[in-house]
Amino acid sequence: MMSAFKPLLEARGLNAWYDRSHVVQDIAFEVRAGEIVTLMGRNGAGKTTTLRTLMGLLAKASGEVLFEGRPLQGQPAHARFHAGLAYVPEDRRIVAGLTVRENLQLGIIASPSRGEMDARIDEIAETFPRLKERLAQEATSMSGGEQQMLAIARAMMARPKMILLDEPSEGIMPVLVDEMFELFARMKGQGTTILLVEQNVERALSISDRAYILDQGRIVHQAGAQALLADEDIQSRYCAV
């Protein structure tokens, strides 16, 4: 079992390009097991591209990604998912025409028995109580916030060691934002490591252990979450939308 003091995920010298634009430039950071770490910065700073690079989703990228000490470079996204690294993009990718339960079933890697599948869905429903009474509902008939929770729940079906979340509170009603951040704290308590990209700086830092700030594709600052929460100068300089 990995020590909480050793990195679960390490990024070394990450670079990424869109056409000729060098969007992520020589980024290096780590996330330890059991942490919530937030990537912060203005729009266009390179946060989402960093997540996509970690998942092997960009054709033009370089650098090393280590997960549990093992290199991931050269492996496609599905292999990284099998290794225990999950990713929920901002667009959610909920499958229309399927129920909440059927969407959850898509998150299972193996081929469990019906009883095992039902048991896992019941476990997930306890962690995501808003979905519990909606399992038979057509998934895209739910609100955007509920669909976001479904996307996260689906990623959690395979019991990943770590999950990458891209702007989970974007466009969601405040009451659901509160519920979502309570959910992230609950997931951490259950042993899930989280790397979070989030524009809601105050809420993200309130549940995070540490944060890295990106500006123009580079990490320009890192600190404990509480120190950053108290540093209004850094927030206004790098994190205002």
Show the residue positions of the predicted features.
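ABC-type ATPase nucleotide-binding domains, specifically the catalytic core motifs of the NBD
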Residues: 19, 60, 75, 100-119, ...
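Conserved ABC transporter NBD signature motif
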Residues: 63-72, 83, 117-121, 223
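ABC ATPase C-loop
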Residues: 155-156
